[in-house]
């Protein structure tokens, strides 16, 4: 079986792999059903990115050239997106004489799961294919800690990126939105009110919820007719 390659029409948003790694239902609500809701955290995250999303800004310090907002694409993964910062470091001791590092900016602090690492690794894999090079690690910069955190792009992480990207394409092609599963991660999710995780997979809860909505609508209509 040959390697799968995706056409331009089939490319999915690279940033979506972070949503997918966190919650497959959240990703589907955003990218399959096109629903979105902002909360304080998403707004803060956008503001943090605005400070680095200047495609015309290039900074050179000593032996490091930093380029912002570089477009990325991988037809093997079927993903496209933007790298916050790519650093090109002069290193005469390396085979290529240039070391490449990707830096992704995030609000808050390091997560307990690997969603940020997955997104960063996906960016690196895109850039590797574009430049036909090898990138061994990158950095996550968190707005709360004001520190860079090293991420090694080992085969385990690369394999997870490939698995998640394949699953994303399968869900997107089939229009799949997984059922809600309530957990601690739901508390700060920007889509909580749209997702309704409290209903979960219990059909009785779902039926009761829909029935209550219908009853409210009937009462509202009856009230309007009586005015």
Predicted regions mapped to residue ranges:
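Alpha-helical structural motif
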Residues: 13, 21, 25, 119, ...
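Non-catalytic, well-ordered alpha-helical scaffold segments
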Residues: 14-15, 26, 83, 117-121, ...
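Aromatic side chains
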Residues: 20-22, 105, 141-142, 209
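Structural motif
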Residues: 10-18, 114-115, 177-184
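Metal-dependent nuclease catalytic regions and adjoining charged, substrate-binding loops involved
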Residues: 75-76, 128-227
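Metal-dependent nuclease catalytic cores that hydrolyze phosphodiester bonds in DNA/RNA
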Residues: 1-102, 202, 214-215, 222-227
């Amino acid at each position: 079986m040959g390697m799968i390659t995706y056409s331009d029409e089939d490319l999915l948003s690279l940033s979506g792999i972070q949503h997918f790694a966190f919650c497959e239902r959240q990703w589907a609500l955003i990218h399959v059903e096109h629903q979105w809701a902002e909360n304080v955290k998403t707004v803060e995250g956008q503001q943090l990115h605005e400070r680095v999303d200047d495609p015309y800004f290039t900074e050179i310090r000593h032996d490091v050239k930093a380029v912002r907002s570089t477009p990325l694409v991988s037809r093997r993964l079927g993903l496209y997106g933007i790298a916050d910062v790519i650093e090109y470091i002069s290193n005469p001791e390396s085979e290529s004489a240039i070391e490449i590092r990707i830096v992704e900016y995030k609000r808050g602090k390091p997560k307990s799961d690997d969603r940020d690492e997955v997104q960063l690794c996906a960016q690196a894999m895109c850039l590797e294919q574009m430049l036909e090079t090898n990138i061994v690690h990158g950095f996550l910069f968190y707005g709360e800690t004001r520190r860079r955190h090293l991420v090694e792009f080992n085969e385990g992480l690369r394999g997870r990126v490939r698995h998640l990207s394949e699953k994303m394409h399968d869900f997107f092609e089939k229009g799949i939105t997984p059922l809600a599963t309530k957990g601690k991660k739901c508390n700060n999710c920007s889509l909580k009110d749209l997702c309704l995780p409290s209903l979960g997979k219990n059909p009785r809860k779902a039926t009761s919820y829909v029935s209550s909505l219908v009853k409210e609508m009937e009462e509202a209509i009856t009230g309007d007719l009586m005015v």
